[in-house]
């Protein structure tokens, strides 16, 4: 449980126990809040990967800047978190709205994604539906 600060955001994140398969970045859906238990850090995935997950901007314990947010900002928030954790390349799993963020993340930062898993999502994007 920790917070990293970027130029416009304080990002709350959590990590599960390190595992032999290394880390996996989990991007959760709309309304995701790591205070809700059980969550992705308690899932069967955590038996195989060190799950890194965070509350996206405007949600949970991450700060809530005024104004509207763009997919580019959501994707760059993930990159900022990985920068702070000194992780260059990582498998990424995005669920629901997190899947849309994952797609923007791989579009903007392709060299940072070793594998991509999308679940229960759509192409979405700015102006797209998140449900």
Give the ranges of each region predicted by the language model:
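Short, flexible active-site-adjacent loop segments at beta-strand->alpha-helix junctions, enriched
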Residues: 30-31, 96, 122-123
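Active-site loop/oxyanion-hole signature of alpha/beta-hydrolase fold enzymes
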Residues: 52-93
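Gly/Ala-rich beta-loop-alpha elbow adjacent to hydrolase catalytic centers
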Residues: 94, 98, 102
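Conserved HGGG/HGGXW glycine-rich cap/lid loop of the alpha/beta-hydrolase fold
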Residues: 5-63, 67
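Flexible "cap/lid" loop of the alpha/beta hydrolase fold
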Residues: 103, 107-108, 114-131
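Residue-level detector of beta-strand structural context in well-folded domains
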Residues: 1-2
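Structural signature of beta-strand start/N-cap positions in the alpha/beta core
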Residues: 23, 50, 88-91, 112-115
């Amino acid at each position: 449980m920790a917070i990293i600060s970027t130029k416009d955001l304080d990002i709350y994140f959590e990590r599960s126990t390190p595992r032999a398969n290394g880390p996996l970045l989990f991007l959760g859906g709309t309304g995701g809040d790591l205070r809700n238990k059980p969550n992705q850090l308690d899932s069967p995935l955590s038996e195989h990967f060190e799950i890194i997950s965070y509350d996206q901007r405007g949600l949970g314990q991450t700060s809530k800047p005024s104004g509207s947010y763009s997919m580019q900002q959501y994707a760059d928030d993930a990159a900022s978190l990985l920068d702070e954790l000194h992780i260059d390349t990582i498998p990424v799993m995005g669920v629901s709205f997190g899947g849309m963020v994952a797609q923007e993340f791989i579009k903007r930062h392709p060299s940072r994604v070793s594998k991509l898993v999308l679940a229960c999502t759509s192409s979405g994007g700015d102006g797209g539906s998140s449900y």
